[in-house]
């Protein structure tokens, strides 16, 4: 088996393919017990009903992945099963899993796309299938090409009376007022502590509809009170998967709604559910907790088990990371809706995506799909826009600026898309030099300069563009720091590398902001996130250990021990206080390699399944909370707690997920190395039992 997996990876592109295998959603989906059980139940009901009617059940499984659904079909009594899987390493793994479960003679595995499958005697399929089971869906339901795949299958691979599992999908939309979500989409005016406006947003930025990319998040984890529901959930689209004529690419539905309460319709929350069988006995919902049909029953079940942990409301319902919910931003209305006011929700989809609009009446001209026209939503991520709008963060920076800048200050800004750096130019300094190597980001910043009539700014398209004569006049170097290429917060240590290269040109007296960055770790018990890395073992009675080995093997080659996750979406309980790992100083000794070692201690090692890691940026040498910008918890964590940790919603943190139980003493040795040549940080956590 090992050679087979390695050969598959080598044939298809080495490291990138190993990374794809290691980070694929196959294991995550297999951990979704509700999905598994409801697919299993729908297969049992569908096949039993066919047999009761005197018909055979010939099953086609498109995108079989691990082979789980095909094996369920055999167990449910299917007369034949054909499974197709185009991702070759996964297909090879499915072949071995099917054999390990003794079904190699009953399931025909076709290692190609369903659109390439042939039907007829001696071909991929001996006959057309009268049962189709598949899960071609993503958060947006149709984003992975479900419409085209179903249409092709109905035309070429399935009988006219085919029964599909799932039978039908329904898309729901809920209109909301949500300032938090809007802060990830729309830039705000930047003001100082006295309320004086420093930067106004150009109109072309304020009215831009933003990125067309789906914004998928765990809606159930939005902080309490962060949104105002303006409508009940509205069913806007239905997809009957067995009806070719209904699976069209382009549709517009207009739904008359009445506002439940007053507010601005800023966004639509979207999710979908699946009616798994034709009779409608089995329903699989992806709704957030407040709209989930089984929320109250599941909450009661949890409260009856006597757990002392305060589980967040959103974690009573089944967890999944492959099918989340999504946020769609609405074109802005200038006046709010009043309670009881009638309005029209416009829902659109093409072959791959959804979008929405609102109006006081039905529209004759359809709303086109959104795309960014201002550049900001191309140059910056949504979480970065959230950072730019973070009032507490901005206040700390601006208060510090007022302390350290003067009318003689010449400020070099080594961050990309830094409105704070631009704001410094409005605070009375002599000049601001903005490092902006990205052409799109530079044009975005130029729009702010022009709209706000900022005169004392010069752009540097590269570090080499800084002339020695001008470098000699610089009094302050400032960075947030932020670079669009950064995935983990400490990837922004690239700032130190830029600073190191410019040092020979800068005066010895230059003030460096931030002065240092400190990495911290927190041992935690994730409620659900650990499942993306947890071994499967058996799943619904089938042995999937071979899949564990496949993912484990390729993770060894491809994975960093720390990955980026927005931890506000994935609740966790702290099992100890915060541990300082390493501090990187930008004022001195940045060029020197650093190695730190230590141990994490937890009192309940059986609960430990992850380590959260983040960085704090210290604007000066004081390490005062008032001059520290943290990408970590909102409140310092000093000890274990049965209350979930509250995380900053505008950052991704680092996560190390554990696959083994630590020793009984509850200690995990760690080491962290900083390489100044690459501006990289390397982590090692020794999970072996001692």
Swiss-Prot record:
It comes from the Eukaryota. Residues 5-355, 364-690 form the SAM-dependent MTase PRMT-type domain. Its EC number is 2.1.1.-. GO terms for biological process: chromatin remodeling; peptidyl-arginine methylation; regulation of DNA-templated transcription. One of its GO terms (molecular function) is protein-arginine omega-N symmetric methyltransferase activity. Essential arginine methyltransferase that can both catalyze the formation of omega-N monomethylarginine (MMA) and symmetrical dimethylarginine (sDMA). Specifically mediates the symmetrical dimethylation of arginine residues in the small nuclear ribonucleoproteins SmD1 and SmD3. PANTHER family: PROTEIN ARGININE N-METHYLTRANSFERASE (PTHR11006), PROTEIN ARGININE N-METHYLTRANSFERASE 7 (PTHR11006:SF4). This is Protein arginine N-methyltransferase 7. It comes from Anopheles gambiae (African malaria mosquito).
């Amino acid at each position: 088996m090992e050679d087979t997996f390695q050969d598959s990876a080598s044939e298809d592109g080495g490291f990138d393919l190993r990374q794809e295998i290691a980070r694929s959603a196959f294991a995550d989906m297999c951990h979704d017990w509700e999905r598994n059980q409801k697919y299993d139940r729908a297969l049992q009901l569908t096949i039993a009903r066919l047999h009761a009617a005197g018909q055979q059940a010939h099953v086609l499984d498109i995108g079989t992945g691990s082979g789980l659904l095909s094996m369920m079909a055999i167990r449910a009594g299917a007369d034949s099963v054909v499974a197709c899987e185009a991702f070759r390493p996964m297909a090879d793994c499915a072949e071995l899993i099917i054999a390990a479960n003794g079904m190699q003679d009953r399931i025909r595995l076709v290692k190609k796309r369903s659109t390439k499958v042939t039907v007829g005697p001696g071909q991929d399929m001996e006959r057309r299938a009268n049962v189709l089971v598949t899960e071609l869906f993503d958060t947006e339901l149709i984003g992975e090409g479900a419409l085209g795949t179903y249409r092709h299958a109905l035309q070429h691979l399935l009988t006219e009376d085919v029964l599909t599992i799932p039978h039908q999908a329904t898309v729901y939309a809920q209109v909301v007022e949500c300032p938090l979500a809007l802060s990830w989409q729309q830039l705000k005016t930047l003001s100082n502590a006295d309320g004086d406006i420093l930067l106004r947003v150009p109109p072309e930025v304020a009215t831009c509809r933003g990125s067309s990319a789906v914004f998928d998040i765990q809606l159930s984890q939005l902080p309490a009170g962060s949104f105002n529901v303006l409508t009940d959930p509205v069913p806007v689209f239905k997809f009957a998967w067995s009806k070719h004529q209904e699976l069209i690419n382009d549709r517009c539905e207009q739904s008359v709604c009445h506002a439940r309460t007053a507010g601005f319709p800023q966004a639509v929350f979207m999710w979908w559910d699946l009616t798994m069988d034709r009779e409608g006995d089995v329903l699989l919902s992806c709704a957030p907790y407040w709209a989930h049909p089984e929320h109250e029953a599941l909450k009661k079940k949890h409260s009856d088990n006597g757990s002392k942990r305060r589980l967040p409301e959103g974690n009573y319902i089944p967890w999944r990371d492959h099918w989340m919910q999504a946020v769609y931003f609405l074109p802005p209305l200038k006046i709010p809706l009043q309670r009881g006011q009638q309005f029209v929700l416009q829902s659109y989809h093409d072959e791959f995506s959804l979008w929405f609009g609102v109006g006081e009446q039905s529209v004759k001209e359809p709303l086109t799909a959104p795309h960014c026209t201002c550049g900001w939503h191309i140059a910056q991520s949504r979480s970065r826009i959230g950072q730019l709008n973070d009032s507490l963060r901005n206040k700390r920076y601006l208060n510090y600026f007022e302390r350290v800048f003067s009318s003689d200050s010449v400020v070099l800004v080594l961050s990309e898309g830094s409105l704070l750096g631009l704001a410094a130019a409005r605070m009375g300094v002599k000049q601001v030099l903005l490092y902006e190597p990205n052409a799109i980001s530079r044009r975005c910043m130029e729009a702010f300069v022009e709209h706000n009539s900022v005169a004392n700014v010069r752009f540097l398209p590269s570090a080499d563009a800084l002339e020695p004569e001008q470098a000699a006049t610089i009094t302050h170097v400032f960075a947030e720091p932020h670079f669009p290429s950064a995935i983990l917060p400490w990837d922004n240590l690239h700032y130190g590398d830029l600073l190191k290269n410019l040092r020979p040109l800068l005066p010895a007296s230059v003030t460096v902001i931030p002065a240092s960055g400190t990495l911290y770790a927190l041992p935690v018990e994730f409620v659900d996130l650990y499942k993306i890395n947890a071994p499967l073992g058996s799943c619904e009675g089938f042995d999937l250990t071979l899949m564990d080995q496949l993912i484990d093997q390729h993770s060894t080659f491809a994975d960093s021990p720390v990955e980026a996750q927005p931890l506000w979406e994935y609740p966790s309980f702290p099992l100890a206080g915060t541990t300082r790992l390493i501090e990187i100083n930008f004022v001195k000794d940045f060029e020197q390699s650093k190695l730190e070692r230590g141990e994490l201690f937890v009192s309940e090692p059986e609960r430990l399944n992850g380590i959260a890691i983040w960085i704090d940026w210290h604007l000066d040498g004081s390490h005062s909370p008032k001059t520290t910008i943290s990408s970590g918890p909102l409140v310092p964590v000093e000890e274990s707690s049965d209350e979930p940790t509250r995380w900053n919603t505008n950052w991704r943190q680092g996560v190390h997920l554990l696959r083994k139980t630590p020793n009984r003493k509850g200690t995990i040795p760690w080491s962290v190395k900083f390489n100044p040549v690459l501006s990289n940080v390397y982590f090692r956590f020794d999970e072996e039992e001692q």
